[in-house]
Amino acid sequence: PGQGFAFGYGSINGMGTPRHELATPALSAGHNPAASAIPVARITDMLENPGGAYDYNGQHRTYPDTRMIFWAGGNPFHHHQDLNRLLRAWSRPDTIVVSEPWWTTLARHADIVFPATTTMERNDIAASSRDRFILAMHQVVKPQAQARNDFDIFADLAEACGFREKFTEQRDEFAWLRFLYDRARHQVQLAGHDMPDFDKFWAAGHVEFPQPAQGYTQFADFRADPVAKPLRTESKKIQLASARIEKFGYADCPGHPVWRAPQEWQLSPLAEKFPLHLLSYQPATRLHGQGDPGRVSLASKIHGREPLRMHPDDAAARGLADGQVVRAFNDRGACLAGLVVDSGLRPGVVAMATGAWLDPLEPGVPGSLCVHGNPNVLTRDVGTSALGQGPVAQSCLVEIEAWVGPLPPIRVHAPPPIAEAGA
């Protein structure tokens, strides 16, 4: 006990649930003829620098000149860093289309919104490679108002482009579910296991696979026979250094582990102006930004603002009290928050969950105060390195002060005003 290491302790919840490596129903993404993709954390860079050069994972690439954005699934106004910079870049494309069930900040910054159904309004199948169940997601209510399934939205778009039949393959929603389930069932049977037919599965509501006789241990096959079960590395072994990465010649990422001082931490010169290190973490009251207007998330807020935790010494030094509304700020932006005095934090560190919907005091104006408490108005938007180009949200310095004056209302949880055509 207490030895080794593992992965997947977070939201995926895969630890302690061993399963056989069996197929699950999944829809192929198909082939994208654009043959172009960027690291997701570099969205703002792409919009700011059409045709600009960047390095990624050993490749020298060029950002596309993006004139149109179609966003379905996800929300950059939740997960991206330095949201004020993103907002400025967001105005550069000619057209932005969003497929979305809710009036999120993303939907509010779109030219066209396709109202999409929620999981309650459509039939679907839930499955994961990390557990032993396949679930039938039965439709609970009919699509509300003008909401439509994403599949139907894209089928109509395909028809407008002249290839509806090629896209749908002459299947509707339920026919696709049956097809995907039957295909997975065939693969499972080839692996020596059994699954009920689709009708029995749909009526029962789930399929449960048997638990393996032995639990899963990371790298167990490799340890038992490194020759027959090599790892997918240059040496086919566990590596602490990579000759391949070394050859990339990246100044910010050599081929071996090194420690380098972050640009923003408490020993950097910027800490004289912004002495508190902000950590942003996954919320306990919602999934990322999903469910933020729900009662569980709302019950956790303080005067309607996202909680911010601070050590008692830091609060006392600033004359702040538990439950008070405060303003967190740096040179990138500012947001309001509800203060929680917490002795479990290290002095000099403050912590705030992600996921509060961005609610600018002046909508559409970069730099406007977020009255709700989205920490990504504060975080830095630079790549981790030329190798990975990931986010560096946890390297962020801020200052905290008391909010003085009337509290602005939270407006992002209510639908925006809708102008009728011809009005």
Task: Name each model-derived stretch.
Residues T117-M120, R132-Q144, R295:
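Short beta-alpha connecting loops at secondary-structure transitions
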Residues S128-R130:
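Short, compositionally biased low-complexity segments
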Residues Q144, D150-F201, K273, G294-R309, ...:
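Long, contiguous, secondary-structure-rich segments that constitute the structural scaffold
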